[in-house]
Amino acid sequence: MGSIDNLMAQKLTSQFPMNTLEPEEFRRQGHLMIDFLADYYRKVENYPVRSQVSPGYLREILPESAPYNPESLETILQDVQTKIIPGITHWQSPNFFAYFPSSGSTAGFLGEMLSTGFNVVGFNWMVSPAATELENVVTDWFGKMLQLPKSFLFSGGGGGVLQGTTCEAILCTLVAARDKNLRQHGMDNIGKLVVYCSDQTHSALQKAAKIAGIDPKNFRAIETTKSSNFKLCPKRLESAILYDLQNGLIPLYLCATVGTTSSTTVDPLPALTEVAKKYDLWVHVDAAYAGSACICPEFRQYLDGVENADSFSLNAHKWFLTTLDCCCLWVRDPSALIKSLSTYPEFLKNNASETNKVVDYKDWQIMLSRRFRALKLWFVLRSYGVGQLREFIRGHVGMAKYFEGLVGLDKRFEVVAPRLFSMVCFRIKPSAMIGKNDEDEVNEINRKLLESVNDSGRIYVSHTVLGGIYVIRFAIGGTLTDINHVSAAWKVLQDHADALLDEAFTAN
């Protein structure tokens, strides 16, 4: 039998000779990859910030089929340099001022590397106790940094979970609110449930409402006004709720925002939560961008009122040096999530889960499988500490104040909405356009300004519309951005505005 077994083993070895995790080769290739990325960051600001390629460019230059034989890492990286990088919009460029930041850091990258290297699938405590327990710890750490109420922490009966994005956080809490309500009013009343927000709330809520089965007619995006700086008005909220109650509907869920996408305005949480609690709504506070700033004492005021909310989330991958994806969600009542999202098939049953003394994060999210996200957040918190993280945020706020001052010095421009954090909303104002005071024409020249500077590749900015006004958003938050990049960006904007305004004047 021994000789037969040996022959079988030799045959299997010859059939499966590949070892894709040989430690020394992993070490060699890992060094190559780190060198490649270090070189990329050394020269990232030399690339056009926004990719200049045309749709379909990559299919034209890559083979039609996968290679039959192996290729070396060196060959693959050469193609990354010549074929992939030209098609990347460089979010880590110091000249990237569009959307909101996706700030990276050495600690964040290394934590991500370790997480990927371990490659654990932490759906419950048993399959990776450290993954679960570290997530318990870092969400409590972060919650304390934000001075969240103890009821949001594991130590106070609540708890935190790391989701992928705010979209997931909102969906999970909306589903939990829906099911909690329907258990009280009956499952056949789903068509009566109403969701409330402002017209400035992130579109993630509308998508979540669709997925959760909320009737589109029952989605209330309450209009905001320039006079209120585009904040959700508590009186308008209460009027909408009363109207729905009079029509036999069931108010369900309110999403308030700390730092809206369009202008970073902050909804009045104390007054809104007071209204919502009067009518038994679930209140979620979305602080995806601005929440990170609230670790600074001078910004903590914007979270006042969160003590009356049911859930709160922010994206550490935006402005907290933690790589995508890492959305921190805290809930006051974890059982509401668990009742809606738990699954317990036979193949997942285990002694630890049955004790009810451990957290099984699969029951706090939509998916079953989950990554070891806590490692990178732990690395960031330990590598930089609360003090340096506060200074990182304050540095960007200071640069935004400086940029706001530059805009104010040029009489052709105006700031359109108050700057609260590190984003400035501005435009070429009507008085700069001789003979063209029509708002549509003013909007058009601002649209052209945005396209012109983005096409140049020197900087990248994005836009929004506030009260019918086309606005350029200048969001500072890149890890590599300094005051010199901000000054240079303003010069680019001025130069392109000069050309456009001269052209408009000549046309007249």
Swiss-Prot record:
Cofactor: pyridoxal 5'-phosphate
The UniProt record lists the keyword Ligase: no
Domain of life: Eukaryota
GO BP: amino acid metabolic process; carboxylic acid metabolic process
Entry EC no(s): 4.1.1.25
Keyword ATP-binding: no
Record keywords: Decarboxylase, Lyase, Pyridoxal phosphate
Gene Ontology MF terms in the entry: pyridoxal phosphate binding; tyrosine decarboxylase activity
Modified residues (N6-(pyridoxal phosphate)lysine): 318
Catalytic activity line of the entry: L-tyrosine + H(+) = tyramine + CO2
GO cellular component terms attached to this protein's record: cytoplasm
Xref: Gene3D superfamilies: Aspartate Aminotransferase, domain 1, dopa decarboxylase, N-terminal domain, Type I PLP-dependent aspartate aminotransferase-like (Major domain)
Membership in a protein family: Belongs to the group II decarboxylase family.
Subunit description: Homodimer.
Name of the protein in question: Tyrosine decarboxylase 4
Native source species: Petroselinum crispum
Gene: TYRDC-4
